[in-house]
Amino acid sequence: MSGTKWTEEQLSAITTRDCNLLVAAAAGSGKTAVLVERIIKIITNEENPIDIDKLLVVTFTSAAAAEMRERIANAISKKLDETPTSKNLQKQLTLLNRSNIMTIHSFCLGVIKNNFHKIDLDPSFRICDQTEGILLKMEIIDELFDDKYDEENQEFIKFIEAFSSYKSDNALKELVLSLYNFIMAGPWPKKWLKAASEDFDIKTLQELDESKWVSVLKESIKIELDGYIKMMQKAVELINETDGLEPYFEGFSSELDLIVNAYNNVESSLNDLYNSLNLITFNRLKTIKKNTVSDENIQNLVKQIRDQVKKKISALIEGTFIATPDKMLDNIIKSYPYINQLTELTSEFIDRFNAKKKEKNILDFNDLEHLCLKILIEDNEENQIVPSTIAQKFKDYFEEVLVDEYQDSNNVQEAIIELVSRKNSDNPNVFMVGDVKQSIYKFRQAKPELFIDKYNSYSLDKGINRKIQLYKNFRSREEVINGVNYIFKSVMSKTVGELEYTDVEALNLGASYPKKKNVDDIIGGPIEVHILDRSDNKEENDESKLQAEEEEIGDVNLEARIIVKRINDLISKKDGSKFKVLDKDTGEYRDLKYKDIVILLRATKNWSEVLLDELGLAGIPVYADTGSGYFESIEIRTIMSLLKVIDNPMQDVPMLSLLISPIIGLSAEELTDIRLIDKEKYFYENIIKISTEKLISEELQEKCEYILSSIDKWRRKSIYMPIDEFIWYLYMDTAYYGYVGAMPNGVLRQANLKILFQRARQFSETSFKGLFNFINFINKLTKSSGDMGSAKILGENEDVVRIMSIHKSKGLEFPVVFLAGCGKNFNLMDLNNKILYHEELGLGPEYINLENRTSITTLPKEAIKKRMKLETLSEEMRVLYVAFTRAKEKLIITGAVRNAEKSIEKWINSAVLDKDVILPYEISKGKSYLDWIGMALCKHKDGKILRKKLGFSSEMCKDDLSMWKISIWNKYELDMYDELDENQEELDVKISILDKDVNKKVKSEVYRRLGYEYEFKESTKLTSNISVSDLKRRNMNDNIDTLEIFDLEEEDNKNKDVITPKFLQEKKGISSAERGTAIHFAMKKIDFSKVGTLKEIKEQLNKLYEEEFILQEEYSSINPYKILSFFKSNLGKKMLDVYNKGGKIYREIPFHTEISSLELDESLPQKYANEKIRLQGIIDCFFKCDDEIILLDYKTDYVENEEEFKEKYKSQLLYYSEAVFKMTGKKVNKRYLYSFYLEKEILI
């Protein structure tokens, strides 16, 4: 790293010592490189080198820790190459294996393992996985509520009546579990519960006035009133500047004074504030004669401003002061018993859960942090953070504690860091690096306030608490940088965003992009904003066009089509010019590839599926890493329905799903016949009746008998088989695993079924057993823990457009970023829950009056609601910042609005209130990313299209370097990839003519067709598709005289790409075929630039496992040495040589071709010579070397005789050679088998 040219600020972050140091590192500023270089400098200091194991480096994820170790190892190795005799470097490389570079959970686990005796813990404890943890919580919460019902405690019963639905108490159970998860992110969960309950033990208005809730309410009211004052002041200013508006002046000024008076009373008592707000009145405006005003747009604007202020002040009074202060106090007092019950229930749940875990000798991830705290704190009873002897040893041992991604820390982690470091001493040693603008994990209880407090209090100058700012961005083009700065200077503030985005925080250009060499090439360019207008406004002459396009295309589809159009434009311009991006390896511009493009979404649910469809229809290769959709996939729903029927067949919904599925395959008519037997009975009862009584056709009776016998067989097996074995048995017995493999996306569907099997295996290893418990667990997982996401079957180097959530994109970068769905409203649904909770403000319930069954919000709930809303919007602001800063060269924003004209009017009304920024109050009222972006762009010179729509001039524009291109699309004018077939009209005419005399001919035609006998009956025995592998197997069998008829279910089960997981016990391992498929998959995905050493290959295999491309058994079955041997062989070296020279290596190439049916069965008559069979297969590898095409097929078989081995696969390689010729037009010159068993290449 010595060759790196560091900036002054980076160098300061690397070399500054003897203080607590906070490094505020903006997106793309080289944060990780700086952290690694700091560590290298510390451990290689010539005067005072510090051993690497005396540093504690805390990372956010295990993957980040592994990457950090790898970077440090590479840096040390590089230095060793320069000075190979350095004993210190050799020592550090050795110590790296035991260094403390880890997540906070890993550190806590180590502390617990070494000090288990201090907390009365059995040293043989294990960490329970998520599955077992969820099941235990479900069991304990049910037991807790059952016991409470048995106690017949009236306070508990009232609590249940008040906050449960009329159907069940599930919502309350979820509330207790949710509150438990929330408070466990704090260091003292029980103390928090106790304090939250005591907050409601107030008796007087004075106590209420002094509460933190009122303080928050006043803060919120102040922000709102300040916004209204600014709005009215702007209106008065416009009145003064516009001829003819003088009659408005007195009324506006009077109303402004009343609002100012209320603002001045905000800090007074609750009663005084209530009264001053109710004094604000709006009288009727004086009339102004027509045609006397110089600018009617201004007149309309000031009236709109006044109307808005009037409505908002009314809403403020009704929303905040839902009653008089006396009545609000009364509601708090009456809510106290409910809050007391909730906190007691949650506290008891903690005790029971801990007791159950102790009984089973297990810990969960929350325990790791809290037990670690218990070990590190001397006296835990008073909840005082007094370091224990063990904590003091850590303080003495660690020379420096370095925390990566500090903006995502929580209070527990902060306490642990303080206890093991010298942070609060005269000799501080904590290094913290992160970017608070990228703190987007509030839902995991991250506390960006920890970073912000230090950022605001630490000094830029010398001292024991210092900060350094890294705001030079080495990622993005100037167009992107300027756009990011313009938007966030306009909209980010301490109110919304929790940080003022000033010139200090702004990104500075650090990346160097060369000028283009070809004048026709397109590089960079303005940030694009595409606004889809969803309104029904249309020109009169559009009526016919509207009727022609009367298809119900959703708004998401239309937005997707805008994206499709822009992708196609970027990939291939109609005028021949091409969009270019900089190749980071060559430093030259190259054509944009699909893999350079990402589509980012705030949430992928309901969006990714549509985008996949629309891009797929347009021929654009695309992949969505959704993190959802797993439980909604047809294959998982079908298997879950099957399991539910086996558990309890008296369930019509899963039974119907099973009956229409391919497993049973009843038709709609058959289902109707079953239903009509007795509409009052369950389907299962009617099936029993049909099978025992001859009520319907013999065929349906036989089917019903089959259904009953199958269910009975499955139910008997479910009793004694472990759930994972049972599920795999069902896959095989029903042939469903093979069936889904033959469906579109079959590889993905089978991989999804494998995941369910693996989940069942995890479940079977817990203390919970049985089909019922597994179904209950999956149901709970679906509802409370979110979707698992479909299986991953795509590597990072595939040339496809990627769709992902903004959260998943954090830390990544892409040449072209589409930020889609920006018109979607923020999700504020949680604010409507009956009881809210907040770390600082405690609990906020609704007050439920059981006598008249009414509910009303309380002052604590309103205070928490207002704070949570601002915090949620601040989080959304930071999420938007993360999305913007993923783009390297091009940023394209899309979003839909209900009515463009009304939206733009709203944006302009917000934008005109201040000449520099959008007022925080206006930002807080924004409902989407597009609202924020639109407000800012209304003030930009490139926002002319927005201002023009409402007739506004450019006087409100700001000077700015950023460049924007704004387009507004009307939903009825969007003409992309949906043109009607040119021949459709002609076809309709022909059909209508045919319809006129169809009745005359239909009878005789029906009889003719029913009596028809097919001339080529023998060909019906032929399969329409066959794989090369099957063809090879048939050719090997000399005794087959006629074509063997293969079972379709057996054929469906064959899939070369998917490893079939066996339910056999672990000691039996995976089969040879599975091992072979695993090696093939590894050879498909492996990066040829990192295969020089055994370590590099191991790291790549480990990455495939960590990213869930291969399972544990598959990972363990692959011998990395065998792969290294291939790359050390002559053939492997030749392949790498081609790759290193920029040649193309074609891997895992599927093909389809046709062969004569006589090649399959020579006994067929000659008339079948023209009957074609579709031959399909997958070519492992081929490449061009020295003007020769070389074909390679990997084999993992046991080889006894090499000649027989060659003969066995000779025909297969001939078919592959023919396929390569058809694809490339070039003959294969050399065909090789590579035997991993022999570690040898064999020329065929």
Swiss-Prot record:
InterPro entries: AddA, DNA_helicase_UvrD-like_C, DNA_helicase_UvrD/REP, P-loop_NTPase, PDDEXK-like_dom_sf, PDDEXK_AddAB-type, Restrct_endonuc-II-like, UvrD-like_ATP-bd. Residues 4-477 form the UvrD-like helicase ATP-binding domain. GO terms for molecular function: 3'-5' DNA helicase activity; 3'-5' exonuclease activity; ATP binding; ATP hydrolysis activity; double-stranded DNA binding. Its cofactor is Mg(2+). One of its GO terms (biological process) is double-strand break repair via homologous recombination. It catalyses: Couples ATP hydrolysis with the unwinding of duplex DNA by translocating in the 3'-5' direction; ATP + H2O = ADP + phosphate + H(+). Residues 517-811 form the UvrD-like helicase C-terminal domain. Coiled coil: none annotated. One of its GO terms (cellular component) is cytosol. ATP binds at A25, A26, A27, G28, S29, G30, K31, T32. It comes from the Bacteria. Keywords: ATP-binding, DNA damage, DNA repair, DNA-binding, Exonuclease, Helicase, Hydrolase, Isomerase, Nuclease, Nucleotide-binding. The keyword S-adenosyl-L-methionine does not apply. Its EC number is 3.1.-.-, 5.6.2.4. Heterodimer of AddA and AddB/RexB. PANTHER family: ATP-DEPENDENT HELICASE_NUCLEASE SUBUNIT A (PTHR11070:SF48), UVRD / RECB / PCRA DNA HELICASE FAMILY MEMBER (PTHR11070). HAMAP family: AddA (MF_01451). The heterodimer acts as both an ATP-dependent DNA helicase and an ATP-dependent, dual-direction single-stranded exonuclease. Recognizes the chi site generating a DNA molecule suitable for the initiation of homologous recombination. The AddA nuclease domain is required for chi fragment generation; this subunit has the helicase and 3' -> 5' nuclease activities. Belongs to the helicase family. AddA subfamily. This is ATP-dependent helicase/nuclease subunit A. It comes from Clostridium botulinum (strain Alaska E43 / Type E3). The gene is addA.
